[in-house]
Amino acid sequence: MGSPSARYEESAEIFEPGAVNATVDFLAELAHGGRALELGIGTGRIALPLARRGVPVHGIDLSRAMVARLRAKPGGDGIGVTIGDFATARVDGTFTLAYLVFNTIMNLTTQEAQVACFRTVAAHLEPGGCFVIEVRVPELRRLPLGQDVLPWHVSRERIVFSSYDTATQGMRGHHVERGEYSTIPFWYVWSAELDLMAQLAGMRLRERWDGGTREPFASDSRQHLSVWEKP
């Protein structure tokens, strides 16, 4: 119950067609007809519709169970997958696009792992290739004064909340459902930190938006879709 992959599947809002279509449109445009590498491919929420758009997709994922669910879907057998840690795993060939969506960068729970992820991506990108990350802006401003817990969902069936350690940038997602409790660790990250990680990997910021429909990223944005380019 407590794995990141299980909770990913339970987050039904990310499967809304509008959200998926906007992200797929954004990625297909950046791919320019080349190959795409998805880090944390999971069950193919993005990879399958992107492949149907004519973009060859290869994925990396640590969860064999998630990949099995991808394989069971129409078109899933046509997508190559490497089983491994997407922060360090290497695959054959180069790509015009690599992407990491739905806050998955935060599943890497140390700064070292996130830096390694950027370097791994840079090693796979062709010159001019792009790396895309979709991630929420840390919600610290929503915390009540003096508190470190932020509720997300409260109902008779389920309670979901996050706790933050501002000294370490550690974050935990907490879920209580049907009498069971689970918790998942994350490491929250700011956009400026991601820009520095990209710089360390030899990439530079190309564009940053509030979402896939290219709304401007502003001080009140709750997420960002950022693109870094390999020279």
Positions of PLM-derived features:
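Conserved class I S-adenosyl-L-methionine
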Residues: 1-32, 34-42
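Class I SAM-dependent methyltransferase SAM/SAH-binding core
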Residues: 44-88
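A short acidic, Gly/Pro-enriched loop at the edge of an enzyme's catalytic core
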Residues: 90-97
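A conserved beta-strand element that flanks and buttresses the S-adenosyl-L-methionine
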Residues: 99-101
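SAM-dependent methyltransferase
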Residues: 132-199
